[in-house]
Amino acid sequence: MAVEYFQEKLNKWRYSPVAGSPDEEGGNATVKPKASFVPVYAGLTIISLITVTVSLVHLLSGTGTTTTFPPCKNPAVRREWRSLTSSEKQNFTQAVICLASIPSTWQPNGTIYDDFAILHGGIGSWCHRSASFLPWHRYTLVVFEKALREHCGFTGQVPYWDWTLDWMNLANSSIFNSVDGFGGDGDRTGQEVVGGGRCVIDGPFAGLQPILYNHTYVRHCIARGFRDGDQAGRISGEYYRPESIGGILRKQSYVELVREVEIYLHNPLHQGVNGDFLAMTAANDPLFYVHHAQLDRLWWRWQQESPDLRLKEYHGKHMYNSTGNATLDDILMYGGFAEDIPVSRVMDTKGGFLCYTY
């Protein structure tokens, strides 16, 4: 019964519109798969959802770990996409394409790249609207970066997209360049594929074929459908004004910060890009990683303002369905795809367990 419950939840989940926005009432696109598809009951997200069911049993009993790590000596530096050289950009995009060709070692279908979307659509869905939103995604980026290195010879770090540089016209950002970016909007002359999106036909990721959209097995192209209210082809940048970011970073408590980062910075881009980006399997679109790296960077900036306090500040409810207050001993779960770890290990990006900066 629990698995069916999680399936139903995952199928219905969409990124929540910002309160008071034009999208608040019924603004999320519905799934309209046009490719051939079958239910996923044969084993795809069932694996991750069963993992959630089992893992939730020990969710609230932290390990009480006292493991400490010395500060890293030479932290890697994550950089903004535009600051990378052409060869560095190609190193990243080719590694992503490579990962989408490596058979999964976690489930019988798809690739390791698909595994990340399944992970996010399963366990990751329970980390939204909760304290674990930022630390869970922080470590997911590290695991993704490690996979790119180990399987595909990636030599850099996951870059971030600073959308404040593009807030006046997000859809025209160089991140969507077809030559050295992520490709642009979906083909407006094509048919709708998933999530109100159409196939991306330009850029390095035009050939990717993810296998899942939410809980439905549907091999499809990467789909996007830029929309700002009634205007197709646009993405609202109102929430990405530099002054808006500054206001969020001035929040004094972690509870306030994580809530506003998710609602006002995370969700609007998912709603504006649409397609794959609209669902909990948003990691189908490589844009997911540079978007979340920017969110992680903002958390890092907030922590650096008062490191003695904020490198240990973790409050709220640990996961979406948790009761009680979150603690640093709470576990970030990855269902065997990566090591389950206490939150404390990822609070400091230069704490030894992690070793990077921005």
From Swiss-Prot:
What happens in the null mutant?
Decreases the production of ustiloxin B.
Recorded metabolic or biological pathway in which this protein acts: Mycotoxin biosynthesis
**Cofactor(s) the protein requires to work:** Cu(2+)
Q: Where does Cu cation A bind?
A: H128, H137
The transmembrane residues are 37-57
Q: Where in the cell is it found?
A: Membrane
Query: Gene3D superfamilies recorded for this chain?
Result: Di-copper center containing domain from catechol oxidase (1.10.1280.10)
Instruction: Kindly state one GO CC term assigned in the UniProt record.
Output: membrane
State the PANTHER family in the record.
TYROSINASE COPPER-BINDING DOMAIN-CONTAINING PROTEIN, TYROSINASE FAMILY MEMBER
Record's protein name: Tyrosinase ustQ
Which species is listed as the source? Aspergillus flavus (strain ATCC 200026 / FGSC A1120 / IAM 13836 / NRRL 3357 / JCM 12722 / SRRC 167)
